[in-house]
Amino acid sequence: MRSHTITMTTTSVSSWPYSSHRMRFITNHSDQPPQNFSATPNVTTCPMDEKLLSTVLTTSYSVIFIVGLVGNIIALYVFLGIHRKRNSIQIYLLNVAIADLLLIFCLPFRIMYHINQNKWTLGVILCKVVGTLFYMNMYISIILLGFISLDRYIKINRSIQQRKAITTKQSIYVCCIVWMLALGGFLTMIILTLKKGGHNSTMCFHYRDKHNAKGEAIFNFILVVMFWLIFLLIILSYIKIGKNLLRISKRRSKFPNSGKYATTARNSFIVLIIFTICFVPYHAFRFIYISSQLNVSSCYWKEIVHKTNEIMLVLSSFNSCLDPVMYFLMSSNIRKIMCQLLFRRFQGEPSRSESTSEFKPGYSLHDTSVAVKIQSSSKST
């Protein structure tokens, strides 16, 4: 293995040398941001070899882009093909699919950036737009998954008369509020970037110190805290859902369909496992990452933090591939709708089986009619 010497150098922005696969972390110690491309503030740079990391990121994001694009387009096609009135869960899932697609559309920019030896040539504004859109849609998906777990928990634990407490209209309002808040934050970030002006850096998706941008670091910290609150909500909701389903399964063990309750309970925990694998590593490491940005750190430590953060981010992006996989592999109704729509699309005639206009949720991963079955069986026992 080749050894690399990490050095600290002070140079002007306009004279940064770039080798084939070397990048320099940028630490701006100036109190004021550069106002134009001719500015030459003193910066401390940390060169390092990123050849292997760039290869891994390019390959990973390419796979995620292809699989995620196909899966989410099909998922969106299926959700839009449901002609009957959608329930609240379907509204949330539709918006999750849209957020996943928007995140996936950001990946080609990252792929080209790493292919181009970590050089960004499209300007600081587009860099900020792509980066902010990426994170915006990731957190929209996280928030909506939290609302899905809350929705299921409420409907399963309330009586039949109260089970419509969360209506379709209310779920639409929730999604609209989430999107408006996200877009408001997005526009704020872009406006702040425009006010700061451009800088002569060809780096985009990389580690940057926050010594003079503590407000942005605090905002990132708030997002991390929000994630852990949502994660706690999901854990409590699905544990409660799983316990209820398993209890009903034992009570109705003599009935032919008793196994469906246990299957749905297992599926609920699979959702929790996938959410944990994709998002928990990234957000657990974010505390270290943000702390490193705010404090003076060695180049060696910055290199470790940067590379670890990039790998964790790949895991988070991979969730956009797993969402449609969960829809289809773990929900017989979604698979049925997909087959019906594809059959009608390619054969030009409706399927003999149940049409999409008569779609009735059953024991799927996110469907909520199981709440009615649980409450009914509870009262009958």
From Swiss-Prot:
Keyword Transmembrane helix included in the entry's annotation: yes
Taxonomy, superkingdom: Eukaryota
Any single Gene Ontology cellular-component annotation: plasma membrane
Residues linked to a glycan: 28, 36, 42, 200, 295
Cystine pairs: 127-204
Family matches, as SUPFAM superfamilies: Family A G protein-coupled receptor-like
Predominant subcellular localization, coarse grouping: membrane
Cellular compartments annotated: Cell membrane
Chain ranges on the Extracellular side, renumbered to this chain: 1-61, 110-128, 193-216, 291-310
Tissue: Broadly expressed. Highly expressed on mast cells.
GO biological process: G protein-coupled receptor signaling pathway
Keyword annotations: Cell membrane, Disulfide bond, G-protein coupled receptor, Glycoprotein, Membrane, Receptor, Transducer, Transmembrane, Transmembrane helix
Cytoplasmic side: 83-88, 150-171, 238-269, 332-381
InterPro entries assigned: GPCR_Rhodpsn, GPCR_Rhodpsn_7TM, GPR34_7tmA
Protein purpose: G-protein-coupled receptor of lysophosphatidylserine (LysoPS) that plays different roles in immune response. Acts a damage-sensing receptor that triggers tissue repair upon recognition of dying neutrophils. Mechanistically, apoptotic neutrophils release lysophosphatydilserine that are recognized by type 3 innate lymphoid cells (ILC3s) via GPR34, which activates downstream PI3K-AKT and RAS-ERK signaling pathways leading to STAT3 activation and IL-22 production. Plays an important role in microglial function, controlling morphology and phagocytosis.
Entry similarity comment: Belongs to the G-protein coupled receptor 1 family.
Protein name per the record: Probable G-protein coupled receptor 34
Species this chain originates from: Homo sapiens (Human)
